[in-house]
């Protein structure tokens, strides 16, 4: 009879569902458990839901088939009983239906129908269970997503420091940085004031400027922002105006911070400029000046108001109140009318008469013999002379307010 195998198949499908559920919830015997991803859990949940729906449809079809078979047998039983009561035509022995057999078949059909009802009920229970499991999975997914966002927010909330950038000109996304000041510090001195004592790379955000990366040098005098460093000739400093405006180089090696960034740090405030020089014999010199840097509308003019520390000859700086604009080979703003100092020498600088200093000149790993080459080098006239190419230089800046704060 076809009803029994169909019901058996449905029971086997139900058993397979139970096995899948027990396998999902049972303990893992492996010593190194592998946790399923959320996508795999979704696939499993949807698969189980489809299996439950298939079992339900199978049970409904089986019950419908059994009902139709029961009706046919009932009709056959009535016809057979009517034929048995008639004596007009003799019936063949094989065409006679024993009432006991009919009763037995009907009993079996009722029992089968009862089992189908039970199976249908179990399938409905399994489907409700799967729906609950699916809701639990969705809830866990939402909780997992919330925890993931909280983890990301926690990572964002950490002060991001000492991150590398391939070029000094690249800005930093402010959404990825939150400082202990509830904002990024304006400069390295502000970092020093909130307790930072370790030198390194930090992200700052001067007022009205996007965030950017700077080298901070922490000393007993406070925090200094490094704006230039030369020591090995790895970076070409003979660049056009836009490069000097934006900045270039490697923050871990040689670099120029950028005129616009330096101006955003100093703003309208007077600042201290420190210049560190080193020759090829290991001798070092430190010079400090009180300076004010103008904006691009002044060609980033540098005004040296007065010496703050170190020895500086009177002939090496312009008179008090005189500003020296910044020049490059493609934008000549120097004080020489008959010469483009940046083109004649090398690199961009605050050229006055082309002869007192140029810390962005060509780097020489050994001192050349030709005087024409020597004049293109890195020099500071009042310390080692006009034609002595220096081995290393560093320029640092700090707001003048630091003097009162320290």
Swiss-Prot record:
User: What tissues express this gene product?
Assistant: Detected in blood plasma (at protein level). Detected in liver. Detected in white fat tissue and placenta. Expressed at high levels in the placenta, heart, liver, muscle, pancreas and lung but expressed poorly in the brain and kidney.
Q: What induces it?
A: Up-regulated when cells are exposed to severe hypoxia (in vitro).
Q: Give the positions of the site Cleavage.
A: 164-165
Q: Where in the cell is it found?
A: Secreted; Secreted, Extracellular space, Extracellular matrix
* Any GO BP: protein unfolding
Per the UniProt entry, the signal peptide is 1-25
Residue positions the entry lists as glycosylated: 177
- Post-translational modification remark: N-glycosylated.
The primary site where this protein sits is secreted
Coiled coil start-end? 100-143
Subunit structure, briefly? Homooligomer; disulfide-linked via Cys residues in the N-terminal part of the protein. The homooligomer undergoes proteolytic processing to release the ANGPTL4 C-terminal chain, which circulates as a monomer. The homooligomer unprocessed form is able to interact with the extracellular matrix.
* Effect after changing residue 161 to A: Loss of proteolytic cleavage. Decreased ability to inactivate lipoprotein lipase LPL
User: What is known about what this protein does?
Assistant: Mediates inactivation of the lipoprotein lipase LPL, and thereby plays a role in the regulation of triglyceride clearance from the blood serum and in lipid metabolism. May also play a role in regulating glucose homeostasis and insulin sensitivity. Inhibits proliferation, migration, and tubule formation of endothelial cells and reduces vascular leakage.
- Effect of altering residue 384 to W? Impaired protein folding
Q: Which InterPro entries match?
A: FIB_ANG-like (IPR037579), Fibrinogen-like_C (IPR036056), Fibrinogen_a/b/g_C_1 (IPR014716), Fibrinogen_a/b/g_C_dom (IPR002181), Fibrinogen_CS (IPR020837)
Keywords on this record?
Answer: Angiogenesis, Coiled coil, Disulfide bond, Extracellular matrix, Glycoprotein, Lipid metabolism, Secreted, Signal
SMART domains named among the record's database cross-references: FBG
Q: What is this protein called?
A: Angiopoietin-related protein 4
Q: What is the effect of changing residue 40 to K?
A: Associated with lower plasma levels of triglyceride and higher levels of HDL cholesterol; strongly reduced inactivation of lipoprotein lipase LPL; no effect on protein secretion and stability of monomers; abolishes accumulation of oligomers
MF terms in GO: enzyme inhibitor activity; identical protein binding; lipase binding; lipase inhibitor activity
The organism is Homo sapiens
